[in-house]
Structure formats: structure tokens, C-alpha cells
């Protein structure tokens, strides 16, 4: 569907066709009156592979993939529908008995928010740390220094329990379908997207085929027009109607060589050839 542009001088589509499931690849989050949506990001290659599986009639199975890395429990994912839940953990390794390194932080958090949660837990007495440092460069790296005698293993458990080293995410796969909200699992969304991609590719090929057929049709007309010297008698016709009638008659004997019916537009283009 086409709508008027902001100044009314042009037309613009009310929506742009999408061949790739960008919603699932990047994830999205939004809120409206009485409803909300939350889509987790997914792996590009997996989306392509599962789209191919759908088109081949195979089962579609895939899970979110977080750019930050980390560990996740998807046992309650339920295809991203309402009520589903995903637990995401950072990775923590013990450098020595006094030092912990937090890396690959949970999706939806930042190093700043995670450090703040650790400091709050320390202030409340949930954990005991000596110092915390942010050594993040290209990848997240937070250094936690412990007091002597503090168990690093128990501290790791406490970090998961009382800080943003572990977070719970509640996906909500809600989309707008035909101007109405609809709850649809991510696997179903991928199937619809794959089918839409096939339809769009077919439409593009049909449009391109029509363009090529038009070019072929006119090049055939042009060849017949010039080779049979139809332009020589143009000066005998004083108006466009009689000229077109003459050309229609001349082309009628070549009907079998033409790909489609001749139109007035075709004849107009022929009469604009510079040699006339």
C-alpha cells in the first residue's frame, strides 16, 4: 500500500518488505497500553539454517544467542511466548584465592550496572570484597579482589545469588499482525518470515521478467520498424490517430514475432526515435 509523503508530492510505502528475520536476529523490546514485547537476539547462521529447514519441510528448532556471551538456562523458554523465562549467567573464573574475573556478562546488563550491583551487595553484607576494577576493553572483564581468608568459591555463589552476575529475562513474543496484536512463538515467526521471503523473491523475479519482456518486445518492434522502413511514409499522415492506424496495420503482419500486443505507448516511443 502506498501513502502520500509528508509534503504530499510523492508516494511512499506504508511498510518496507523484509527478506530477513531482523526482529529475531537483533531482538527488540517495546511497551504499549496493556501489552509489551521482548524478543531476544538469535544467531544469524542459525536463523538461515532453520529457515532452510522449514522450506525443506523439516523441524524448526533454535534458541537465543547473546552477543555478550555468558551461560543461559533455556528450559523455561517455551518458544519465547508469554510466561517464559530465561536465566542468564556471567562467566566467573578464579585467578587465585584472592582474585576473581567476571567476563561474558549477562544480556541486558553493562559492566557499569554489574559493578554497581556488586558494590550494593557488598554494602548490604551479602558478599565481602576488597576492591573491584573494570578492565574492559574489547571484551568485558571485571576484576574482583577478595580479603584474605574469604572463600572464592562461596563468593562466586554469592555473586550469582545477589548481583547481576545472574539475571532472569522474561521474553514476550508479541507482534502486530493485520493491525492487531498477536502472540506468536519465535519459531512460527521464522516460518512466516521464510515464506514471505520466498514470496518476495518470486515477486522480484516476476517484476524483472516483465521488465526484460518489455525490453525484448520493444527491441523487436524497433527492429521491425527500421528494417521494414515504416518511417518513410510518416509525412503522409498529418495527425497521430491516422499515423498510429497505419503503424498498427503494418505491424499486424508480424504479429507472430511479437511477445505481446502493441500499445499506443509503444508506437509513441517508436515515433520518438531520432531518425524520424
Where does each model-flagged region fall?
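P-loop NTPase nucleotide-binding/switch module
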Residues: 1-18
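C-terminal interaction appendages of subunits in large macromolecular complexes
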Residues: 16, 22, 28-31, 35-276
Amino acid at each position: 500500500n502506498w501513502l502520500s509523503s509528508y509534503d504530499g508530492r510523492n508516494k511512499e510505502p506504508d511498510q518496507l518488505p523484509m527478506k530477513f528475520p531482523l526482529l529475531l536476529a537483533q531482538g527488540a523490546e517495546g511497551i504499549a497500553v496493556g501489552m509489551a514485547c521482548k524478543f531476544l537476539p538469535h544467531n544469524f547462521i542459525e536463523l538461515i539454517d532453520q529457515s532452510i529447514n522449514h522450506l525443506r519441510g523439516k523441524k524448526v528448532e533454535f534458541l537465543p544467542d547473546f552477543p555478550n556471551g555468558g551461560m543461559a538456562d533455556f528450559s523455561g523458554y517455551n518458544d519465547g511466548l508469554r510466561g517464559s523465562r530465561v536465566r542468564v549467567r556471567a562467566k566467573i573464573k578464579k585467578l587465585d584465592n584472592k582474585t576473581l574475573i567476571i567476563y561474558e556478562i549477562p544480556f541486558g546488563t553493562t559492566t557499569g550496572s554489574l559493578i554497581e550491583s556488586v558494590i550494593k551487595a557488598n554494602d548490604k553484607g551479602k558478599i565481602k570484597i576488597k576492591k573491584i576494577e573494570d578492565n574492559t576493553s574489547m571484551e568485558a572483564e571485571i576484576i574482583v579482589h577478595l580479603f584474605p581468608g574469604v572463600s572464592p568459591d562461596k563468593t562466586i555463589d554469592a555473586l550469582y545469588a545477589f548481583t547481576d552476575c545472574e539475571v532472569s529475562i522474561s521474553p514476550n513474543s508479541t507482534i502486530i499482525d493485520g493491525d492487531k496484536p498477536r502472540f506468536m512463538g519465535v519459531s512460527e515467526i521464522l516460518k512466516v518470515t521464510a515464506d514471505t521471503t520466498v514470496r518476495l523473491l518470486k515477486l522480484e523475479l516476476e517484476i524483472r521478467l516483465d521488465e526484460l519482456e518489455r525490453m525484448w518486445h520493444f527491441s523487436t518492434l524497433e527492429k521491425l520498424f527500421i528494417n521494414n522502413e515504416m518511417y518513410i511514409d510518416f509525412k503522409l499522415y498529418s495527425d497521430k490517430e491516422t499515423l498510429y492506424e497505419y503503424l498498427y496495420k503494418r505491424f499486424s503482419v508480424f504479429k507472430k514475432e511479437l511477445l505481446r500486443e502493441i500499445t499506443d505507448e509503444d508506437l509513441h516511443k517508436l515515433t520518438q526515435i531520432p531518425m524520424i
